[in-house]
Amino acid sequence: TWFGKTGKTDALLSVIMRKRGNIYQSDGEHAPNKEKPAALFAKGSVGITDSNKAGASLRLYRNNTTEPGNSTQTHGDSGLRDRKTVQNDVQFWYQYAPVDNSLINVKSTLYLSDITIKTNGHNKTAEWRNNRTSGVNVVNRSHTLIFPGAHQLSYGAEYYRQQQKPEGSATLYPEGNIDFTSLYFQDEMTMKSYPVNIIVGSRYDRYKSFNPRAGELKAERLSPRAAISVSPTDWLMMYGSISSAFRAPTMAEMYRDDVHFYRKGKPNYWVPNLNLKPENNITREIGAGIQLDGLLTDNDRLQLKGGYFGTDARNYIATRVDMKRMRSYSYNVSRARIWGWDVQGNYQSDYVDWMLSYNRTESMDASSREWLGSGNPDTLISDISIPVGHRGVYAGWRAELSASATHVKKGDPHQAGYTIHSFSLSYKPVSVKGFEASVTLDNAFNKLAMNGKGVPLSGRTVSLYTRYQW
Protein backbone atom coordinates (compact mmCIF):
# COMPACT_ATOMS: atom_id res chain seq x y z
CA THR A 1 0.00 0.00 0.00
CA TRP A 2 1.27 3.47 -0.96
CA PHE A 3 -0.17 6.76 0.22
CA GLY A 4 0.97 10.26 -0.55
CA LYS A 5 -0.22 13.83 -0.02
CA THR A 6 1.15 17.10 -1.38
CA GLY A 7 -0.67 20.39 -0.99
CA LYS A 8 -4.25 19.94 -2.17
CA THR A 9 -3.69 16.54 -3.79
CA ASP A 10 -3.69 13.10 -2.19
CA ALA A 11 -3.55 9.58 -3.62
CA LEU A 12 -3.58 5.98 -2.46
CA LEU A 13 -2.58 2.78 -4.26
CA SER A 14 -3.03 -0.71 -2.83
CA VAL A 15 -2.20 -4.09 -4.42
CA ILE A 16 -3.16 -7.40 -2.80
CA MET A 17 -2.21 -10.87 -4.06
CA ARG A 18 -3.06 -14.07 -2.20
CA LYS A 19 -3.02 -17.82 -2.65
CA ARG A 20 -5.17 -20.21 -0.66
CA GLY A 21 -5.48 -24.00 -0.71
CA ASN A 22 -7.71 -26.57 0.96
CA ILE A 23 -9.29 -25.45 4.21
CA TYR A 24 -8.33 -27.57 7.22
CA GLN A 25 -11.41 -27.85 9.45
CA SER A 26 -11.77 -28.69 13.11
CA ASP A 27 -13.36 -32.08 12.35
CA GLY A 28 -10.06 -33.25 10.85
CA GLU A 29 -11.22 -33.02 7.22
CA HIS A 30 -10.08 -30.76 4.40
CA ALA A 31 -12.69 -28.70 2.54
CA PRO A 32 -11.63 -28.69 -1.14
CA ASN A 33 -10.64 -25.19 -2.17
CA LYS A 34 -8.05 -23.53 -4.41
CA GLU A 35 -8.01 -19.84 -5.18
CA LYS A 36 -5.70 -17.03 -6.31
CA PRO A 37 -7.35 -13.68 -5.59
CA ALA A 38 -5.72 -10.43 -6.68
CA ALA A 39 -6.99 -6.89 -6.19
CA LEU A 40 -5.91 -3.37 -7.06
CA PHE A 41 -7.40 -0.30 -5.45
CA ALA A 42 -6.52 3.28 -6.37
CA LYS A 43 -8.10 6.54 -5.33
CA GLY A 44 -7.20 10.19 -5.31
CA SER A 45 -8.61 13.67 -4.85
CA VAL A 46 -7.64 17.22 -5.71
CA GLY A 47 -8.72 20.53 -4.20
CA ILE A 48 -9.64 22.69 -7.19
CA THR A 49 -10.33 25.74 -4.99
CA ASP A 50 -10.98 26.28 -1.30
CA SER A 51 -14.64 25.40 -1.91
CA ASN A 52 -14.41 22.81 -4.68
CA LYS A 53 -12.96 19.32 -4.48
CA ALA A 54 -13.14 16.32 -6.80
CA GLY A 55 -11.95 12.75 -6.70
CA ALA A 56 -12.14 9.29 -8.21
CA SER A 57 -11.48 5.68 -7.28
CA LEU A 58 -10.88 2.44 -9.17
CA ARG A 59 -11.08 -1.13 -7.90
CA LEU A 60 -10.08 -4.19 -9.94
CA TYR A 61 -10.60 -7.71 -8.60
CA ARG A 62 -9.67 -11.05 -10.16
CA ASN A 63 -10.02 -14.53 -8.70
CA ASN A 64 -9.56 -18.00 -10.20
CA THR A 65 -10.89 -20.74 -7.93
CA THR A 66 -11.61 -24.44 -7.80
CA GLU A 67 -14.25 -24.98 -5.16
CA PRO A 68 -17.21 -27.22 -4.28
CA GLY A 69 -20.70 -26.29 -5.33
CA ASN A 70 -21.66 -26.28 -1.66
CA SER A 71 -18.90 -24.75 0.45
CA THR A 72 -20.46 -26.06 3.69
CA GLN A 73 -19.71 -29.69 2.72
CA THR A 74 -16.54 -31.10 4.24
CA HIS A 75 -15.99 -33.86 1.72
CA GLY A 76 -15.49 -33.30 -1.97
CA ASP A 77 -18.73 -34.96 -3.07
CA SER A 78 -20.51 -31.70 -3.82
CA GLY A 79 -19.02 -31.35 -7.30
CA LEU A 80 -15.89 -29.24 -7.85
CA ARG A 81 -16.22 -26.25 -10.15
CA ASP A 82 -13.71 -23.96 -11.85
CA ARG A 83 -14.86 -20.41 -11.27
CA LYS A 84 -13.45 -17.14 -12.63
CA THR A 85 -14.53 -13.78 -11.23
CA VAL A 86 -13.76 -10.42 -12.83
CA GLN A 87 -14.95 -7.26 -11.09
CA ASN A 88 -14.38 -3.63 -12.10
CA ASP A 89 -15.63 -0.75 -9.94
CA VAL A 90 -15.23 2.95 -10.70
CA GLN A 91 -16.47 6.01 -8.83
CA PHE A 92 -16.34 9.78 -9.44
CA TRP A 93 -17.34 12.44 -6.94
CA TYR A 94 -17.50 16.22 -6.65
CA GLN A 95 -17.90 18.24 -3.46
CA TYR A 96 -18.86 21.88 -3.06
CA ALA A 97 -18.47 23.37 0.43
CA PRO A 98 -18.04 27.17 0.58
CA VAL A 99 -16.04 28.14 3.63
CA ASP A 100 -18.35 31.07 4.45
CA ASN A 101 -21.64 29.10 4.34
CA SER A 102 -22.31 26.37 6.91
CA LEU A 103 -25.59 25.43 5.22
CA ILE A 104 -23.98 24.10 2.05
CA ASN A 105 -21.75 21.03 1.89
CA VAL A 106 -23.04 19.04 -1.06
CA LYS A 107 -21.39 15.93 -2.47
CA SER A 108 -22.42 14.17 -5.69
CA THR A 109 -21.21 10.67 -6.52
CA LEU A 110 -21.48 8.62 -9.70
CA TYR A 111 -20.62 4.91 -9.50
CA LEU A 112 -20.48 1.86 -11.72
CA SER A 113 -19.83 -1.77 -10.78
CA ASP A 114 -19.45 -4.57 -13.33
CA ILE A 115 -19.06 -8.23 -12.26
CA THR A 116 -18.64 -11.19 -14.61
CA ILE A 117 -18.58 -14.75 -13.26
CA LYS A 118 -17.85 -17.82 -15.39
CA THR A 119 -18.18 -21.33 -13.97
CA ASN A 120 -17.31 -24.71 -15.47
CA GLY A 121 -18.34 -27.83 -13.57
CA HIS A 122 -17.61 -31.51 -14.14
CA ASN A 123 -20.19 -33.11 -16.47
CA LYS A 124 -21.96 -29.76 -16.68
CA THR A 125 -22.21 -27.04 -19.31
CA ALA A 126 -20.63 -23.68 -18.63
CA GLU A 127 -22.43 -20.99 -16.63
CA TRP A 128 -21.92 -17.29 -17.24
CA ARG A 129 -23.52 -14.22 -15.74
CA ASN A 130 -22.93 -10.49 -15.73
CA ASN A 131 -24.17 -8.11 -13.06
CA ARG A 132 -23.93 -4.37 -13.66
CA THR A 133 -24.93 -1.68 -11.18
CA SER A 134 -24.88 2.04 -12.00
CA GLY A 135 -26.13 4.83 -9.81
CA VAL A 136 -25.92 8.36 -8.47
CA ASN A 137 -26.02 9.69 -4.91
CA VAL A 138 -26.40 13.35 -3.86
CA VAL A 139 -26.27 14.47 -0.22
CA ASN A 140 -26.01 17.85 1.50
CA ARG A 141 -25.02 18.51 5.11
CA SER A 142 -25.94 21.72 6.89
CA HIS A 143 -24.89 23.04 10.30
CA THR A 144 -27.09 25.57 12.03
CA LEU A 145 -28.01 26.90 15.48
CA ILE A 146 -31.75 26.81 16.13
CA PHE A 147 -33.30 26.59 19.59
CA PRO A 148 -32.81 24.46 21.60
CA GLY A 149 -29.38 23.50 20.24
CA ALA A 150 -26.99 22.86 17.37
CA HIS A 151 -28.31 20.93 14.38
CA GLN A 152 -26.52 18.86 11.76
CA LEU A 153 -28.93 18.26 8.89
CA SER A 154 -28.32 15.56 6.28
CA TYR A 155 -30.64 15.13 3.31
CA GLY A 156 -30.29 13.68 -0.14
CA ALA A 157 -31.36 11.20 -2.77
CA GLU A 158 -30.01 8.06 -4.44
CA TYR A 159 -30.92 6.10 -7.53
CA TYR A 160 -29.36 2.94 -8.94
CA ARG A 161 -30.18 0.39 -11.60
CA GLN A 162 -29.04 -3.23 -11.51
CA GLN A 163 -29.04 -5.44 -14.59
CA GLN A 164 -28.37 -9.19 -14.69
CA LYS A 165 -27.70 -11.26 -17.79
CA PRO A 166 -27.12 -15.04 -17.62
CA GLU A 167 -25.94 -17.40 -20.35
CA GLY A 168 -25.25 -21.12 -20.66
CA SER A 169 -26.98 -23.14 -17.93
CA ALA A 170 -26.88 -20.29 -15.42
CA THR A 171 -30.39 -19.68 -14.11
CA LEU A 172 -29.45 -18.97 -10.51
CA TYR A 173 -29.42 -15.26 -11.36
CA PRO A 174 -32.13 -14.79 -13.99
CA GLU A 175 -32.29 -12.08 -16.62
CA GLY A 176 -33.91 -8.94 -15.33
CA ASN A 177 -33.34 -5.53 -13.82
CA ILE A 178 -33.92 -3.66 -10.58
CA ASP A 179 -34.57 0.08 -10.14
CA PHE A 180 -34.15 1.52 -6.65
CA THR A 181 -34.89 5.11 -5.59
CA SER A 182 -34.56 6.62 -2.12
CA LEU A 183 -35.01 10.01 -0.46
CA TYR A 184 -33.74 10.60 3.07
CA PHE A 185 -33.56 13.29 5.76
CA GLN A 186 -31.94 13.34 9.19
CA ASP A 187 -31.55 15.95 11.93
CA GLU A 188 -28.94 15.32 14.62
CA MET A 189 -29.39 17.84 17.42
CA THR A 190 -27.09 18.54 20.37
CA MET A 191 -28.98 20.45 23.04
CA LYS A 192 -27.30 23.58 24.34
CA SER A 193 -28.29 23.45 28.01
CA TYR A 194 -28.49 19.69 28.56
CA PRO A 195 -26.16 16.71 27.84
CA VAL A 196 -28.64 15.26 25.35
CA ASN A 197 -28.31 14.28 21.69
CA ILE A 198 -31.45 13.64 19.63
CA ILE A 199 -31.66 12.16 16.14
CA VAL A 200 -34.83 12.15 14.05
CA GLY A 201 -35.11 11.21 10.41
CA SER A 202 -37.04 9.43 7.74
CA ARG A 203 -36.32 7.54 4.54
CA TYR A 204 -38.51 6.81 1.54
CA ASP A 205 -37.58 3.81 -0.61
CA ARG A 206 -39.14 2.73 -3.89
CA TYR A 207 -38.23 -0.59 -5.47
CA LYS A 208 -39.19 -2.00 -8.87
CA SER A 209 -37.94 -5.22 -10.46
CA PHE A 210 -38.76 -6.88 -13.77
CA ASN A 211 -38.20 -10.40 -15.03
CA PRO A 212 -39.51 -11.72 -18.40
CA ARG A 213 -40.91 -14.84 -16.70
CA ALA A 214 -42.61 -13.30 -13.68
CA GLY A 215 -43.34 -9.76 -14.75
CA GLU A 216 -43.00 -6.69 -12.55
CA LEU A 217 -42.74 -6.30 -8.78
CA LYS A 218 -43.17 -2.94 -7.03
CA ALA A 219 -42.73 -1.98 -3.40
CA GLU A 220 -42.38 1.29 -1.49
CA ARG A 221 -42.07 2.31 2.13
CA LEU A 222 -41.64 5.38 4.34
CA SER A 223 -39.32 4.48 7.25
CA PRO A 224 -39.04 6.97 10.15
CA ARG A 225 -36.48 6.65 12.92
CA ALA A 226 -35.62 8.37 16.20
CA ALA A 227 -32.80 8.03 18.71
CA ILE A 228 -31.72 9.73 21.91
CA SER A 229 -28.57 9.60 24.04
CA VAL A 230 -28.14 11.16 27.48
CA SER A 231 -24.86 11.74 29.35
CA PRO A 232 -25.78 12.82 32.90
CA THR A 233 -22.11 12.57 33.96
CA ASP A 234 -18.79 12.54 32.14
CA TRP A 235 -18.51 8.77 32.70
CA LEU A 236 -22.07 7.56 31.94
CA MET A 237 -24.01 7.46 28.66
CA MET A 238 -27.49 5.99 28.06
CA TYR A 239 -29.21 5.59 24.71
CA GLY A 240 -32.36 4.32 23.06
CA SER A 241 -33.73 4.19 19.52
CA ILE A 242 -36.68 3.06 17.43
CA SER A 243 -36.58 2.65 13.66
CA SER A 244 -38.59 1.08 10.87
CA ALA A 245 -37.37 -0.36 7.58
CA PHE A 246 -38.43 -2.44 4.64
CA ARG A 247 -36.63 -4.95 2.41
CA ALA A 248 -37.95 -6.03 -0.97
CA PRO A 249 -37.09 -9.57 -2.14
CA THR A 250 -34.11 -9.90 -4.45
CA MET A 251 -34.40 -11.41 -7.91
CA ALA A 252 -32.37 -14.43 -6.82
CA GLU A 253 -34.71 -15.09 -3.89
CA MET A 254 -37.73 -15.04 -6.20
CA TYR A 255 -36.55 -16.72 -9.42
CA ARG A 256 -33.54 -18.98 -8.82
CA ASP A 257 -34.03 -22.61 -9.83
CA ASP A 258 -30.47 -23.96 -10.23
CA VAL A 259 -28.61 -26.50 -8.08
CA HIS A 260 -28.00 -25.19 -4.56
CA PHE A 261 -25.45 -27.87 -3.58
CA TYR A 262 -24.67 -31.56 -3.90
CA ARG A 263 -24.72 -34.07 -1.07
CA LYS A 264 -23.52 -37.64 -1.62
CA GLY A 265 -23.81 -37.03 -5.34
CA LYS A 266 -27.43 -35.87 -5.19
CA PRO A 267 -28.34 -32.26 -6.02
CA ASN A 268 -30.41 -29.98 -3.84
CA TYR A 269 -32.29 -27.56 -6.12
CA TRP A 270 -33.60 -24.08 -5.56
CA VAL A 271 -37.36 -23.81 -6.10
CA PRO A 272 -38.64 -20.40 -7.33
CA ASN A 273 -41.18 -18.51 -5.24
CA LEU A 274 -42.82 -15.76 -7.28
CA ASN A 275 -45.18 -14.87 -4.42
CA LEU A 276 -42.58 -13.39 -2.07
CA LYS A 277 -43.75 -10.19 -0.40
CA PRO A 278 -41.65 -7.24 0.80
CA GLU A 279 -40.49 -7.40 4.41
CA ASN A 280 -41.37 -4.63 6.92
CA ASN A 281 -39.88 -4.37 10.39
CA ILE A 282 -39.61 -2.19 13.48
CA THR A 283 -36.50 -2.34 15.69
CA ARG A 284 -36.18 -1.01 19.25
CA GLU A 285 -32.85 -0.72 21.04
CA ILE A 286 -31.79 0.39 24.49
CA GLY A 287 -28.40 0.42 26.20
CA ALA A 288 -25.83 2.19 28.33
CA GLY A 289 -22.07 2.71 28.51
CA ILE A 290 -19.56 3.85 31.10
CA GLN A 291 -15.94 5.00 30.95
CA LEU A 292 -13.71 5.26 34.02
CA ASP A 293 -10.18 6.70 33.92
CA GLY A 294 -7.51 6.23 36.57
CA LEU A 295 -9.34 3.32 38.16
CA LEU A 296 -6.35 1.27 39.41
CA THR A 297 -3.38 3.21 38.01
CA ASP A 298 -2.83 6.72 36.67
CA ASN A 299 -2.89 5.61 33.02
CA ASP A 300 -5.61 2.97 32.93
CA ARG A 301 -9.11 3.11 31.42
CA LEU A 302 -12.20 0.90 31.78
CA GLN A 303 -14.97 0.98 29.17
CA LEU A 304 -18.23 -0.99 29.42
CA LYS A 305 -21.15 -0.97 26.99
CA GLY A 306 -24.25 -3.13 26.86
CA GLY A 307 -27.45 -3.14 24.86
CA TYR A 308 -30.63 -5.03 24.02
CA PHE A 309 -32.54 -4.96 20.75
CA GLY A 310 -35.82 -6.40 19.55
CA THR A 311 -37.17 -6.55 16.00
CA ASP A 312 -40.75 -7.27 14.96
CA ALA A 313 -40.97 -8.17 11.28
CA ARG A 314 -43.90 -8.70 8.95
CA ASN A 315 -43.40 -11.01 5.96
CA TYR A 316 -39.85 -11.78 7.13
CA ILE A 317 -37.88 -13.30 4.22
CA ALA A 318 -36.26 -16.56 5.36
CA THR A 319 -34.61 -19.54 3.63
CA ARG A 320 -35.52 -23.17 4.14
CA VAL A 321 -33.31 -26.14 3.16
CA ASP A 322 -35.37 -29.35 2.92
CA MET A 323 -32.91 -32.26 3.05
CA LYS A 324 -35.64 -34.91 2.75
CA ARG A 325 -37.01 -33.56 -0.52
CA MET A 326 -33.60 -32.13 -1.52
CA ARG A 327 -34.84 -28.64 -2.28
CA SER A 328 -34.27 -25.09 -1.02
CA TYR A 329 -36.48 -22.04 -1.28
CA SER A 330 -37.15 -18.57 0.11
CA TYR A 331 -40.42 -17.93 1.90
CA ASN A 332 -42.23 -15.33 3.98
CA VAL A 333 -42.74 -15.69 7.72
CA SER A 334 -45.92 -13.71 8.38
CA ARG A 335 -44.73 -12.53 11.80
CA ALA A 336 -41.17 -12.94 13.08
CA ARG A 337 -39.44 -11.84 16.24
CA ILE A 338 -35.65 -11.31 16.45
CA TRP A 339 -34.00 -10.17 19.68
CA GLY A 340 -30.63 -10.22 21.36
CA TRP A 341 -28.12 -8.89 23.86
CA ASP A 342 -24.64 -7.53 23.34
CA VAL A 343 -22.16 -6.59 26.10
CA GLN A 344 -18.60 -5.35 25.57
CA GLY A 345 -15.85 -4.41 27.98
CA ASN A 346 -12.30 -3.13 27.57
CA TYR A 347 -9.61 -2.47 30.18
CA GLN A 348 -6.39 -0.75 29.08
CA SER A 349 -3.28 0.00 31.09
CA ASP A 350 0.49 -0.08 30.76
CA TYR A 351 0.41 -3.71 31.90
CA VAL A 352 -2.50 -5.33 30.08
CA ASP A 353 -5.10 -4.77 27.35
CA TRP A 354 -8.17 -6.94 27.94
CA MET A 355 -11.31 -7.06 25.79
CA LEU A 356 -14.34 -9.11 26.82
CA SER A 357 -17.57 -9.46 24.82
CA TYR A 358 -20.81 -11.41 25.14
CA ASN A 359 -23.51 -11.89 22.49
CA ARG A 360 -26.75 -13.80 22.11
CA THR A 361 -29.30 -13.51 19.29
CA GLU A 362 -32.59 -15.38 18.91
CA SER A 363 -35.11 -15.56 16.05
CA MET A 364 -38.61 -17.05 16.19
CA ASP A 365 -41.75 -17.42 14.11
CA ALA A 366 -44.14 -15.34 16.22
CA SER A 367 -47.20 -17.24 14.95
CA SER A 368 -46.08 -20.88 15.30
CA ARG A 369 -43.53 -20.19 18.10
CA GLU A 370 -40.92 -22.23 16.19
CA TRP A 371 -37.27 -21.21 16.10
CA LEU A 372 -36.01 -19.85 12.77
CA GLY A 373 -32.41 -20.95 13.39
CA SER A 374 -30.80 -17.69 12.24
CA GLY A 375 -29.59 -16.56 15.68
CA ASN A 376 -26.40 -17.12 17.67
CA PRO A 377 -26.15 -19.06 20.97
CA ASP A 378 -24.50 -17.56 24.06
CA THR A 379 -20.98 -16.62 22.97
CA LEU A 380 -18.23 -15.19 25.18
CA ILE A 381 -14.94 -13.93 23.71
CA SER A 382 -11.93 -12.92 25.83
CA ASP A 383 -8.91 -11.26 24.19
CA ILE A 384 -5.86 -10.42 26.35
CA SER A 385 -2.60 -8.76 25.27
CA ILE A 386 0.31 -8.37 27.71
CA PRO A 387 3.63 -6.58 27.03
CA VAL A 388 6.71 -8.76 27.44
CA GLY A 389 9.60 -6.65 28.65
CA HIS A 390 9.97 -3.12 27.28
CA ARG A 391 10.99 -3.75 23.67
CA GLY A 392 7.63 -3.75 21.90
CA VAL A 393 6.89 -7.47 22.27
CA TYR A 394 3.33 -8.49 23.18
CA ALA A 395 1.89 -11.90 24.05
CA GLY A 396 -1.78 -12.55 23.31
CA TRP A 397 -4.39 -15.09 24.33
CA ARG A 398 -7.86 -15.30 22.78
CA ALA A 399 -10.57 -17.63 24.08
CA GLU A 400 -13.95 -18.14 22.40
CA LEU A 401 -16.63 -20.02 24.33
CA SER A 402 -19.94 -20.88 22.66
CA ALA A 403 -22.94 -22.60 24.23
CA SER A 404 -24.85 -25.40 22.52
CA ALA A 405 -27.05 -24.33 19.60
CA THR A 406 -30.43 -25.79 20.52
CA HIS A 407 -32.79 -23.11 19.17
CA VAL A 408 -32.65 -24.36 15.58
CA LYS A 409 -35.25 -24.93 12.88
CA LYS A 410 -37.59 -27.86 13.37
CA GLY A 411 -35.88 -30.99 12.08
CA ASP A 412 -32.36 -29.53 12.16
CA PRO A 413 -29.81 -31.18 14.51
CA HIS A 414 -28.59 -29.45 17.66
CA GLN A 415 -24.93 -28.38 17.68
CA ALA A 416 -22.68 -28.90 20.69
CA GLY A 417 -20.93 -25.98 22.34
CA TYR A 418 -17.19 -25.44 22.02
CA THR A 419 -14.17 -23.65 23.48
CA ILE A 420 -11.36 -22.50 21.20
CA HIS A 421 -8.04 -21.05 22.40
CA SER A 422 -5.66 -19.06 20.19
CA PHE A 423 -2.24 -17.60 21.04
CA SER A 424 -0.19 -14.87 19.41
CA LEU A 425 3.14 -13.08 19.66
CA SER A 426 3.55 -9.64 18.10
CA TYR A 427 6.43 -7.20 17.73
CA LYS A 428 6.02 -3.41 17.45
CA PRO A 429 9.45 -1.82 17.91
CA VAL A 430 9.46 1.72 19.24
CA SER A 431 12.59 2.54 17.22
CA VAL A 432 10.96 1.62 13.87
CA LYS A 433 7.71 3.55 13.63
CA GLY A 434 5.00 1.90 11.54
CA PHE A 435 6.49 -1.63 11.60
CA GLU A 436 4.54 -4.56 12.99
CA ALA A 437 4.99 -8.34 12.78
CA SER A 438 3.07 -11.16 14.44
CA VAL A 439 2.60 -14.93 14.50
CA THR A 440 -0.75 -16.46 15.54
CA LEU A 441 -1.73 -20.03 16.40
CA ASP A 442 -5.50 -20.30 15.94
CA ASN A 443 -7.45 -23.16 17.53
CA ALA A 444 -4.23 -24.19 19.26
CA PHE A 445 -5.62 -27.43 20.69
CA ASN A 446 -7.34 -28.40 17.41
CA LYS A 447 -10.77 -28.70 19.03
CA LEU A 448 -13.80 -29.83 17.04
CA ALA A 449 -16.14 -26.87 16.64
CA MET A 450 -19.32 -26.39 14.61
CA ASN A 451 -21.24 -23.19 14.13
CA GLY A 452 -25.01 -23.04 14.64
CA LYS A 453 -25.68 -24.35 11.13
CA GLY A 454 -23.39 -27.37 11.49
CA VAL A 455 -20.46 -26.05 9.46
CA PRO A 456 -17.06 -27.08 10.93
CA LEU A 457 -14.82 -24.16 11.87
CA SER A 458 -11.13 -24.01 10.97
CA GLY A 459 -8.75 -26.39 12.70
CA ARG A 460 -5.27 -25.59 14.04
CA THR A 461 -3.85 -22.83 11.83
CA VAL A 462 -0.62 -20.82 11.88
CA SER A 463 -0.73 -17.27 10.51
CA LEU A 464 2.18 -14.91 9.84
CA TYR A 465 1.61 -11.18 9.43
CA THR A 466 3.87 -8.20 8.80
CA ARG A 467 3.25 -4.55 8.00
CA TYR A 468 5.35 -1.45 7.48
CA GLN A 469 3.79 1.97 7.11
CA TRP A 470 5.70 5.13 6.36
Task: Give the location of each predicted region.
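Predominantly transmembrane beta-strands of Gram-negative outer membrane beta-barrel pores used
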Residues: 1-32, 39-47, 55, 306, ...
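Membrane-embedded beta-barrel scaffold of Gram-negative outer-membrane proteins
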Residues: 4, 9, 105-121, 239, ...
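Transmembrane beta-strands of outer-membrane beta-barrel pores
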Residues: 6-8, 17-21, 60-64, 112-116, ...
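Short loop/turn motifs that connect adjacent beta-strands in outer-membrane beta-barrel proteins
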Residues: 7-8, 50-53, 98-105, 143-152, ...
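Flexible loop and strand-edge segments within Gram-negative outer membrane beta-barrel domains
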Residues: 20-22, 26-27, 31-37, 51-106, ...
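Surface-exposed extracellular loop regions of Gram-negative outer-membrane beta-barrel proteins
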Residues: 71-73, 206-210, 216, 230, ...
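Signature of Gram-negative outer-membrane beta-barrel scaffolds
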Residues: 150-237, 241-243, 248-250, 259-263, ...
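Gram-negative outer-membrane beta-barrel transporters
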Residues: 191-198, 298-314, 329-408, 436
